[in-house]
Structure formats: C-alpha cells, structure tokens
Amino acid sequence: MNDVTEASLPKAIFLMGPTASGKTALAIALRKVLPVELISVDSALIYRGMDIGTAKPDAAELSAAPHRLLDILDPAEAYSAADFRRDALAAMADIVAAGRIPLLVGGTMLYFKALLEGLSPLPSADPEVRARIEQQAAEQGWNALHQQLQEIDPVAAARIHPNDPQRLSRALEVFFISGKTLTELTQTSGDALPYQVHQFAIAPASRELLHQRIEQRFHQMLASGFEAEVRALFARGDLHTDMPSIRCVGYRQMWSYLNGEIPYDEMVYRGVCATRQLAKRQVTWLRGWEGVHWLDSEQPEQALNKVLQVVGASQN
C-alpha cells in the first residue's frame, strides 16, 4: 500500500504487550488526551465471571475508559480469531463513524495478527475426516502420520512435532479436505486491514522486572479472591479443562488444585510459571513484529509522549 493511499485511510492504534506490562494504564492515559475508544484484544477478557484471574480492568478503570469486546461470552462458549476479527472490524467502523480513533489494547497476538493480515481460508473441521485420521493413528502410530505429512507438506512437518497430535491431525485434515497443503493455504491470507495502523508494544526494560511484576500480580489476585472466583466456575458443573476459558493461565492451575490434583503451593508455583511462559511467548511474537514502536513501561510519561508524537506526526 503506498503512502498516499495509506494516509487517506482512517487511523487505528495497536497497543500490544505481554501480561502485566501496564497496557491498561497507558490506554486510560491516552484516552484522556486523544479522541480514542478502546477495544480489548484479549482471549480471556471476553469471558463473563472471569475478572480477577484475567486482571480485567476494574469498575473505576472502565468508567474512565470503557472497553469494547469485554464480557461478551459465557465461559462455556468458544471464540475464534475469525470471530474476533469480525467483531473488532464492526467496532472499529462504529468508532470511526463517530469521528474517533480505535485503540486496540491487549496481549492476544493471534488476534492482532488476524486483524492486521486477514485470515487464511482454511476449511472447517470435518468430524469424519478427523475420525479417519485418528483411527489411522491408533493403528499405525502418530510417527507414521508425521512421515505421511512430511511427504505431503514438508514445511508444516518441520514445524509440527510428531508428539503434537492435535496440530498434526489438523495439517492432514486440511489437505484431505481441500487438496491443498496447510503451507499453501496459510500463504494465501485474507483481506488486509483498511486502516492506517500505528503499532506500539509496551514492556519493562528487563525480563527480571517483568517476572517480578507477574509474581506480585498473581499473589494480589489470590488476595483479591481468585480462588472463590474459580470455585464459582467449578461449582457450575458444565465447565471443564478442555474449554478455552478454563485453559487460561491461572485458571487451569487453580482448577487442578480444586480438583484435588495438586496442593495449594504447587498451584501458586505453576500459576506464576505459566504466566511467565505466556509473557515470554508474547514478547517473542512482538520481537518479530514489523513496524512496532517499543515503549518502556517503567517510563509511563515518556511512553505516553512517544505515542502522541508518532500519532500526531501522521496528522501533519
């Protein structure tokens, strides 16, 4: 897209970052000085009744800066990157129509990627094809299926471990349904985002500081009633660990504790470790992200000024 065309597009701001990096505080500060409306980009914050363990903005924060795509689903419901893209595009169009700028804030990098680049036209899952693959795996073993994938799609086979049956099965299923490899189809992305996007990533300067923040926040969550929050979900009887909501970091560890699988101290240790691993994955995504401006979460005023400078410069 050339500069002239891009300059004529409506503006949007992405504020990305790992968990516990200060995204919400910066987003609220930005709303005070820019004509922005916030859209949450977080696969955990979409769920109702999951407030403490997701560090959902509190009532005061939401009053200062309302977020869209927050509390839109029951924890029993699933939500895909395609669902997010559809809902985010509708919210963005609504915000622009009101003469304001969409500010998308969160840490679900897959959602940002889907929004920015569009989605690959992959076929929907087919239970019959999946059952056939699983039967073949039961008879021959997953290693044999991995060798089969290597012949069909060597690029995907190099990326997928033989001990990852879910992804291995999906790669074969895509080929059997469409006649095209996963690699071919993922290279054909959908529609690019029709906005002039300014992208920012906020994080502490050191990994140690981020780890420290994560541990402090996990203990704050426990002190704020996280166990009671998960007990209420556990008591419903219709939720389980195969659901995306209960697989969220912190929730799945607390679920194991409530299920009698691990002691309390082990739950705390695993919860902190899982959150750190999530943050590491988020930072890895961002390190490879093109066109992103980095912000130091320990310098909030400097971070705010940098966003204003970049967004303001595009108006000149």
From Swiss-Prot:
Binding positions for substrate per the UniProt entry: T19, A20, S21, G22, K23, T24
Family membership: Belongs to the IPP transferase family.
Originating species: Klebsiella pneumoniae subsp. pneumoniae (strain ATCC 700721 / MGH 78578)
Positions of region (Interaction with substrate tRNA): 42-45, 166-170, 247-252
UniProt enzyme class: transferase
PANTHER family for the chain: TRNA DIMETHYLALLYLTRANSFERASE
Site, as annotated: Interaction with substrate tRNA: T108, R130
Sequence intervals crossing the membrane: none
Function as written in the Swiss-Prot or TrEMBL entry: Catalyzes the transfer of a dimethylallyl group onto the adenine at position 37 in tRNAs that read codons beginning with uridine, leading to the formation of N6-(dimethylallyl)adenosine (i(6)A).
GO molecular function term, any single one: tRNA dimethylallyltransferase activity
Subunit field text: Monomer.
GO BP field: tRNA modification
E.C. number(s) listed in UniProt: 2.5.1.75
Signal peptide from the UniProt entry: none
Name of the featured protein: tRNA dimethylallyltransferase
Cofactors named for this entry: Mg(2+)
Keywords: ATP-binding, Magnesium, Nucleotide-binding, Transferase, tRNA processing
Catalysed reactions listed for this entry: adenosine(37) in tRNA + dimethylallyl diphosphate = N(6)-dimethylallyladenosine(37) in tRNA + diphosphate
